């Protein structure tokens, strides 16, 4: 029980810390919501040790627009240091997006060393700095608490079992992408709501959807979200069309409502 409450407390601390980091940069609730014309603020979500001794540092972002999707190419205006390009997104969906990517650092990474993600758009520069502060250590139970998915310690993230590989297309041709995932059937549907889960969403089962992760602007995806309950493989199919040549990364996300797994597909458009 002591460990359980420690995890919950840590999750709350990480959540509050993220809010503190963002508070000076995101709109207050009293401000008028803006559909367009706003900037993006990166966010450090916390760090997690890996089985091989390395450490993953997780980042997300807050697109302050309610409707507008933004594109910021890799470079001085979308930069992670050290390294420059560490797998960060270039396409930004509206509002708060958590745990979007991680940066793996070696096991001897110093406590005072930082991973810094800088985003600049519309003349505004925002920065997220991640380092190994003990209070910012997270695990899957903390992630479930942050996403409102309860605290099922036995839950495991979905697993992709098949899907499209890298593709090449010539304009104006489209590409069709598929991804199939399966899950352990947790969290299970609740017949009687647990006291600690009151206010959280009901488990929705496994779903798979496609998003634009990287590439030039002008990508259109046909609807690609499928949900089919518990412990069944789910296949999502989407058709992507492009306006510009370039290298794109399209991401399939499998979620059980609490934990997620992603699969990236690179599409080269000529």
What are these regions (language model features)?
Residues 14-23:
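C-terminal segment of classical bacterial N-terminal signal peptides
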Residues 105-148:
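Ser/Thr/Pro-rich, low-complexity mucin-like regions
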Residues 28, 37-44, 48-50, 61-63, ...:
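Extracellular/lumenal mature domains of secreted and surface-exposed proteins
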Residues 6-13:
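Sec-dependent N-terminal signal peptides
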Residues 1-4:
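Positively charged n-region of N-terminal signal peptides that target proteins for export
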Residues 98-104:
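Ligand-binding face of N-terminal immunoglobulin V-set domains in extracellular IgSF glycoproteins
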Residues 55-61:
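Short, well-ordered beta-strand segments enriched in hydrophobic/aromatic residues
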Residues 25-32:
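Cleaved targeting-peptide boundary
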């Amino acid at each position: 029980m002591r460990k359980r409450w420690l995890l919950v407390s840590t999750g709350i601390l990480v959540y509050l810390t993220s809010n503190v980091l963002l508070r000076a940069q995101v709109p207050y609730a009293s401000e008028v919501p803006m559909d367009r014309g706003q900037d993006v603020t990166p966010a450090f979500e916390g760090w997690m040790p890996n089985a091989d001794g390395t450490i993953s540092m997780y980042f997300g972002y807050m697109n302050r627009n309610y409707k507008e999707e933004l594109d910021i190419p890799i470079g001085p205006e979308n930069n992670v240091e050290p390294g420059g390009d560490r797998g960060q997104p270039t396409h930004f969906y509206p509002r708060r997006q958590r745990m979007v990517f991680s940066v793996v650092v070696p096991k001897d990474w110093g406590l005072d060393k930082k991973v810094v993600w800088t985003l600049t758009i519309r003349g505004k520069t925002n920065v997220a700095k991640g380092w190994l502060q003990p209070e910012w250590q997270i695990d899957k139970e903390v992630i479930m608490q942050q996403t409102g998915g309860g605290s099922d310690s036995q839950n495991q993230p979905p697993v992709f079992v098949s899907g499209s590989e890298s593709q090449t297309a010539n304009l104006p041709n489209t590409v069709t992408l598929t991804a199939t995932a399966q899950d352990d059937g947790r969290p299970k549907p609740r017949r009687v709501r647990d006291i600690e889960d009151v206010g959280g969403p009901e488990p929705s089962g496994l779903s798979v959807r496609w998003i634009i992760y990287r590439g030039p602007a002008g990508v259109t995806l046909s609807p690609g979200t499928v949900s089919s309950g518990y412990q069944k493989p789910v296949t999502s199919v989407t058709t992507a069309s492009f306006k510009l040549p370039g290298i794109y990364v399209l991401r399939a996300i499998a979620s059980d409502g609490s934990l997620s797994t992603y699969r990236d597909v690179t599409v080269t458009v000529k």
